[in-house]
């Protein structure tokens, strides 16, 4: 369903659809209200499978065109700055309730400034801060604490089932042009396709020149052997 209307002095639109898969259907609803120089957007989704993945994302975007100085060319419009205020909402991942905390994202002069995006369940969390841009000196940092990497593979439905709780930092710079990425993670109870590999310390780097990832992993199975894996992957 798609609906557009113009009640009063605002523009209102709604979009609803379902994505059916063999594992069940995913229902998605998007609603936006625009008025003056701002847009309020809400995204709701939910599935119909045995394990629940659902939630709500809400944000208010303000568009600002800053005044130019008198000596500048008045024919050229100043750049548009967008300030997005992320609203507090909840998300259910694998039957577990997570909180999305208030944060702010600013788009200005070709850069994206992420200010304390915070996603948590009790002591577990994902926090993002930094600048996304083509410039190599601009870096964005992700901090993970006991984040189940299985969520990513469950949602993506890649046919590969990795499990484990990841803790540690990840960095990315020059993301929009020549990205340089690295991570140092401790993954507790790393598993693959229902098999337990053990606790893992993983260092990874994205090599833009070869379009591949270099991985150095130390995996220790409890009370047994230590496995060391070091190789580039493409």
Report the location of each language-model feature.
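Interface amphipathic segments
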Residues: 1-230, 234
């Amino acid at each position: 369903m798609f609906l557009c209307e113009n009640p009063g002095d605002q523009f209102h639109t709604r979009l609803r659809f379902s994505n059916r898969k063999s594992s069940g259907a995913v229902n998605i609803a998007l609603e936006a209200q625009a008025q003056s120089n701002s847009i309020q957007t809400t995204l709701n989704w939910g599935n119909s499978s045995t394990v629940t993945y659902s939630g709500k994302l809400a944000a208010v975007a303000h568009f600002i065109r800053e005044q130019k100085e008198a000596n500048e060319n008045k024919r050229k419009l100043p750049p548009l700055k967008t300030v997005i205020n992320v609203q507090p909402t909840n998300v259910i991942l694998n039957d577990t309730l997570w909180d999305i905390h208030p944060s702010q994202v600013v788009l200005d002069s070709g850069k994206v400034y992420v200010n304390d995006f915070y996603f948590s369940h009790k002591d577990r969390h994902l926090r993002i801060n930094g600048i996304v841009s083509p410039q190599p000196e601009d870096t964005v940092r992700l901090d993970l604490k006991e984040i189940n990497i299985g969520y990513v593979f469950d949602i993506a439905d890649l046919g590969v089932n990795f499990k484990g709780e990841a803790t540690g930092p990840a960095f990315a710079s020059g993301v929009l042009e020549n990205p340089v990425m690295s991570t140092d993670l401790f993954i507790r109870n790393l598993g693959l396709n229902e098999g337990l590999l053990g606790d893992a310390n993983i260092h990874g780097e994205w090599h833009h020149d070869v379009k591949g990832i270099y991985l150095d992993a130390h995996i220790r199975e409890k009370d047994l052997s230590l496995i060391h894996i070091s190789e580039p992957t493409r």
